[in-house]
């Protein structure tokens, strides 16, 4: 009897990708096969995103495609928290579960396709679990949910309040990743710098010593594992200052992904964000004094309800002052269930949002171009993401996969994915570098 085959669609952010990895690991550990095609599989699981309307539409389209090509579909993920929306469009889905509902997903799979006889000597799963990323990097999710109440966000409604994983459990997973050959660990959560707050920074034993479930302790321990460690989704809380020396010492990468969202005090107040542009500017300056190599990435929203031209100009001025290395920008999109819908603020016309988005991107492109020019002539370590003989593409310590820039590399010797090589930077453009491996 052949093992049941499950096709899988993973949509949304890296945190959802980790959820998909966990489900697939569970399936593989029970002997299921994972299929690349819907057609011929025993069922399809669609892990959805439900944050923005565009993401909801993409999720609903993916469910429809799976129904057309297979017919047996289980839906999970953030959009699964709204089963009525899914049933209205696709009444024939077999089961719907919300985010992080791993056991419910497995139970639904068992009802459609019971697990095969299990032979642990044949159905081997890697100790680090099944990963959907390339072998040389992996996401490490340290918590679920978020206790902040930003007015534009529905993550707490979808995923609940902050629930931190025990630090010894997180470090054990990281250790397994390193043992499996992972060269770069990307730490993710909804609020990485709040790690452990919900459990009062509970202590645990790790390698015969006591460590706290806290951002600093986690950073320090990961920094001893001998791989690149990159911090994502960090709020600019004061205690983040304690981690910057670890970056200056080369323990973890000099990189912080901080979603500032805006710079205008009025807009930040309406967003209910725990930040202020003057404080963040001073904090970034202080961080760079401690770690001159630091790269800051952030995301921003333009066209938020009530945003005036003065507010937007304040954001552009802040970009000029802060000169952060990487920035993404989104045009505000109303999210069903978000508090922003009830604030009674004047909506920004779509054409104004579009114009401000272009102005923002032009400003940041100019900043990025000037900063990257300063890299020309330097020799930088680069991790290889793609290789074709002596031509390849990789990333510096200042660039995360898929969202930041790349280094386009030529080499006298064949390049291998996952290797970290020294590259002499010979040219730059708006977002990327070009150089030769030495």
Swiss-Prot record:
Keywords: 4Fe-4S, Cytoplasm, Iron, Iron-sulfur, Metal-binding, S-adenosyl-L-methionine, Transferase. GO terms for cellular component: cytosol. [4Fe-4S] cluster 2 binds at residues 146, 150, 153. Binds 2 [4Fe-4S] clusters. One cluster is coordinated with 3 cysteines and an exchangeable S-adenosyl-L-methionine. One of its GO terms (molecular function) is 4 iron, 4 sulfur cluster binding. Its cofactor is [4Fe-4S] cluster. SUPFAM superfamilies: Radical SAM enzymes. Residues 4-114 form the MTTase N-terminal domain. Residues 373-438 form the TRAM domain. The keyword 4Fe-4S applies. It is an enzyme of class 2 (transferase). One of its GO terms (biological process) is tRNA modification. Residues 132-370 form the Radical SAM core domain. Belongs to the methylthiotransferase family. RimO subfamily. Catalyzes the methylthiolation of an aspartic acid residue of ribosomal protein uS12. This is Ribosomal protein uS12 methylthiotransferase RimO. It comes from Brucella ovis (strain ATCC 25840 / 63/290 / NCTC 10512). The gene is rimO.
